[in-house]
Swiss-Prot record:
Purpose: Catalyzes the sequential NAD-dependent oxidations of L-histidinol to L-histidinaldehyde and then to L-histidine.
GO MF entries: histidinol dehydrogenase activity; NAD binding; zinc ion binding
Pathway: Amino-acid biosynthesis; L-histidine biosynthesis; L-histidine from 5-phospho-alpha-D-ribose 1-diphosphate: step 9/9
One Pfam assignment: Histidinol_dh
Organism: Pelagibacter ubique (strain HTCC1062)
Annotated disulfide bonds: none
A biological process term (GO) from this entry: L-histidine biosynthetic process
Annotated EC: 1.1.1.23
Coiled coil start-end: none
Lineage: Bacteria, Pseudomonadati, Pseudomonadota, Alphaproteobacteria, Candidatus Pelagibacterales
NCBIfam families, per database record: hisD
Protein name (database record): Histidinol dehydrogenase
Enzymatic class: oxidoreductase
Length: 428
């Protein structure tokens, strides 16, 4: 069922590149239809949003009432509430350690330079909800924003026939989110990016979503901020060895595959027998999975089991894939981990299962996908800050440094720049 590759094959690199590119192309194919939706929402506002909500989500409600929200929350099991509370506390604790220090510096000329972190004023959090509900995504996006000091938090989350998941609503209440909209997809992204009569636009949009949502965020970027990476369909790469438990490894792969039909699950091992055992376990475990159809499609289309006898080749391949999630489920992971440069998050050892990081370990699960871990990072408190430089020059400072600036400005042909300095240091 799952594609099995041997790195010793002379066409291995080409085959792997083709498989990875094929999935990337699927993720990127949605841009044309997304642009049409965004233009429609910009032109027709709430009317366009309702049109797409009725078509895709069978929903005719843009914003649930406070009464509807409270009624839904009251129906939530206490165990789930406590689990959300625990996750909130742990995520808050870890992210509160990510505080950033303002810088203030005065030089010998009494010029004062400052660099300050200023919270973004308004942020919209996109929480997926078309095939499953994710209260954890509310926490992962909202808690760092709370730590940063964002004043206005907005949540967009596609409801099912206008009804949102009680756990998602409880998590939003826990995070003191007062603006909640039961909309999703590209139209929701356009709504918070450009605003409508019912929805006030925001300064930044963050949060994971399917390929359509990811494409929409890329399209609105520039008119509104987005996170420093695109959080698209989920990915995991697992490196295991003969000491790994094949039952555990299979369940980790399936756990990622059940997210989305475009989820990417890759296994790499130096041991052929573990690959066979994991493959067998996957077939058996899928029979017990409620979301087996999604997981099976994902594994069939984007799953890869790779035999790779060289440690260096494994390291190079992982850095090339640059996965969202990486599990180093090997005995020698300490020797390997320092050489891994491209991954959204790295789970070390047999107990650090990716599913734990999705919920209450404390680290963030909104991570770069589609190989963007080569140049970007997951959501952190830093995502919700702007950095502003403050400059206060003394008379002595401009008189001392100004002549050099005039020289450079004239050299670059920017005479106006040079003259604006000259006028301040000209002797009368």
């Amino acid at each position: 069922m799952i594609k099995i590759l041997d790195s010793k094959n002379k066409n291995f690199d080409k085959t792997l590149d083709a498989l990875l590119s094929k999935r990337k192309n699927k993720v990127q194919l949605n841009s044309v239809s997304v642009i049409k939706i965004i233009k429609d929402v910009k032109k027709n506002g709430d009317k366009a949003i309702l049109k797409y909500e009725k078509r895709f989500n069978k929903n005719s409600i843009i914003a649930p009432s406070i009464k509807q929200i409270n009624r839904a929350i009251q129906s939530l099991d206490q165990k789930v509430k406590k689990a959300i509370d625990l996750a909130y506390d742990r995520i808050y604790k870890f992210h509160s350690l990510q505080k950033f220090k303002n810088i203030s510096y005065t030089d010998k000329l009494k010029n004062k330079l400052e660099y300050k972190y200023v919270p973004i004023e308004s942020v919209a959090i996109y929480v997926p909800g078309s095939t499953a509900s994710y209260p954890s995504s509310v926490l992962m996006n909202a808690v760092p924003a709370i730590v940063a000091g964002v004043k206005r938090l907005v949540m967009v989350n596609p409801g099912q026939k206008g009804k949102q998941n009680p756990a998602v609503l409880y998590a939003a209440k826990k995070c003191k989110i007062k603006e909640i909209y039961s909309i999703g997809g590209p139209s929701a992204i356009a709504a918070v990016a450009y605003g409508t009569k019912k929805i006030k636009k925001v300064d930044k949009i963050i949060g994971p979503g399917n390929s359509y949502v990811a494409a929409a965020k890329k399209e609105v970027f520039g008119d509104v901020g987005i996170e420093g990476m695109i959080a698209g369909p989920s990915e995991v790469t697992i490196v295991c060895d003969k000491f790994s438990n094949p039952e555990w490894i299979a369940s980790d792969l399936i756990g990622q595959a059940e997210h989305d039909n475009l989820a990417q699950c890759i296994l790499i091992s130096k041991d052929k027998s573990i690959i066979k055992k994991v493959n067998y376990e996957i077939i058996n475990q899928l029979k017990e999975l409620p979301r087996a159809v999604i997981a099976k499609n994902s594994l069939l289309n984007n799953g890869i089991l790779i035999y790779m006898p060289s440690d260096q080749k494994i390291i190079n391949t992982v850095n090339k894939i640059a996965p969202e999630h990486l599990e180093l489920n090997t005995k020698n992971y300490k020797k390997v981990v320092s050489k891994i440069k491209n991954a959204g998050s790295i789970c070390l050892g047999k107990y650090a299962v990716m599913a734990m990081t999705d919920y209450n370990v404390g680290s963030n699960h909104v991570l770069p996908t589609n190989s963007s871990a080569r140049y970007s990072s997951g959501v952190s408190v830093n995502e919700f800050y702007k950095r502003i430089s403050y400059i206060n020059l003394s008379k002595k400072g401009i008189e001392t440094l100004g002549p050099s600036v005039i020289t450079l400005a004239n050299y670059e042909g920017l005479v106006g720049h040079a003259k604006s300095v000259e006028k301040r240091i000209r002797r009368k």
